[in-house]
């Protein structure tokens, strides 16, 4: 009808990480194609098991006058909503309704940051977390390799044998779930590591698969390969130091502390000192 604004066509894609689906809605077909390529392997096909996403975000693409990606991220909880901001994006998310919006330019980095933040907030309520850690599956078991930048996450990933499946070389996704006992007699509470599309120096997406976590290794470079046990208190402190955490929220700080305590009482933690040689993998497992 004359006088009515033309309806804008909308495009959607569901990106599922760690079994949590996020639907991204946009009016830009080119941006949609970029997301489908960027998150290949984590995009849920129509009718897939996670096609009914847990959360919806509408993306408003516009030149961002305040664009400065070097500005630190801010995540604040106010009136039931999470307000997220960095130099290159602004976003808002209401957990009660599962809906939110993102204002950014047409780039993959801003929405990648929002996804990381949202997943950390979701996992904090469930006893899980995202971790500065490489992770891989071997013989049906997942191993985490945590450390600060330069500790060797990418190196240990490059050295992985052919029978290992890389989940990530940068950000590990850990969920607290019921897992089947080894003897098949039932299930027990445990931790499962999932592949992520969050990449480090390898610039390679992890495999979209998962396995129970068998051990966490705290990385350190040295003159020889060695594995040393870590006390529960030290393990908890170092685990907390490597968790992704963005929010200025006391309740979530408590949740993260509890998640770290629960994890180190359930999963063995070791310090892995290594030289950049593939033989280090003979000591893992």
Q: Where are these predicted regions, by residue range?
A:
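Conserved glycine(s) of the Walker
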Residues: 151-153
